Amino acid sequence: LSTFADLLQFRMQPRTFYITNIGRLYCDEEGLTAPLKGASMSQLPFIESAWLLIENGKFHSWGSMSLFPETSISAHDATNGWVIPAWCDSHTHLVYAGSRENEFVARINGLTYEEIAQQGGGIINSALRLRNTTEDQLYDSALIRLHEIIQFGTGAVEIKSGYGLDLESELKMLRVIRRLKSATNCEIRSNFLAAHAVPPEYKGRQDDYVNHIINDMLPKVVEEGLADFIDVFCDRGFFTQGNTEKILSAGMKYGLRGKIHANELDYSGGVQAGVKYGALSVDHLECVGEAEITALLNSQTISTVLPSTSFFLKLPYAPARKMIDAGLPLSLATDYNPGSSPSGRMSFILSLACIHMNMLPEEAVNAATINGACAMGVEMEFGSIAKNKFANCLITQPLENLAYIPYSFGSDLVKKVILKGEMQ
């Protein structure tokens, strides 16, 4: 290796190695490529005292340590730690300019999230800051957050725009996300969310802003190939169901599948709009009744719940238990953002799901892995420890049982993170 560039290229090559002495390996013999739903969400097969072979950055094979083959291939000793799939966080806003702890204090003093937004805080506050932040500054701060969530165990993440709310600022955000895609081994999907809030210059003219998104922003985003999805915040005080459907329809014409922020604050019609236009997922879902469950049961749309938003804003939690028992597929995500969920730690999301939404630990892990992968369209290559999927997994400390992960909500149980066959 004659030069630094040669050394760097060598280190970036996906490796071939064994993980040995695994206390418990959560492996997917079936090769799941569809979300688990209903009763199947509690099924999480494993083998004990195992080895796992990673070959050229992908999962190759596994078996019992009692049958470990003689080999010259290098091995990493898990020392009885468990191996589980890396988290798949399908809903984040981790590209942003500045934190909003002043609004945190305002809520302590009695203001609601909606009242803060009406006073120019919330999403508008973030948008005004972002417009005055350079692309490089945005990239540098977002890269720090990306490295942080990788160390928490996240191996695939969806990142939304939506703090620009004008053409140049939305493009700036999406270009940052594009740069992040090649910065680490974490798999990233980008989501165009100009319909996050109506900016001040369009106050009282939501229809005009929607037309601006459709006619001016969307063609440019597609021309530059900056987005994998299109999104709308369909809720009370934000975008109407009618305008949500207009944006989803326009996105479909450009080949962008929809995702929706729906029913966080009220029964908004967002779920029905998502089902009507074949959205990949509808997210939040704090306000869900029989009509929404029925609509989702007759669709291919995944329900993504975001319990840390309910925790941080003191909102009701999504009725996850009711939704799973009805037969729906659920995914869990962080909603990592500066205003309503300033954390990207997926293990805490599992704890909230179990404590506040009565999800079983096995259901929570599936919701945060294979179902999360499905909710951002990466399930063919990520989300489970299956042959020929990319080797994204975690090695934990030795555990007594799976329930200890959500139970010990303040502990960092992850010893090693492996993404695409590379130790992080």
What function would you assign to each model-found segment?
Residues 85, 147, 245, 249, ...:
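Alpha-helical segments flanking ligand/cofactor-binding loops in enzyme cores
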Residues 36-41, 368-370, 390-424:
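C-terminal cap of metal-dependent C-N hydrolases
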Residues 4-70:
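N-terminal metal-binding scaffold of metallo-dependent hydrolase/deaminase domains
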Residues 257, 267-382, 396-400, 409, ...:
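Active-site-adjacent C-terminal substructures of enzyme catalytic domains
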Residues 126-141, 147, 155-268:
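Metal-coordinating catalytic core of metallo-dependent amide/deamination hydrolases
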Residues 18, 24, 73-77, 190, ...:
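Conserved beta-strand scaffold positions in the cores of enzyme catalytic domains, especially
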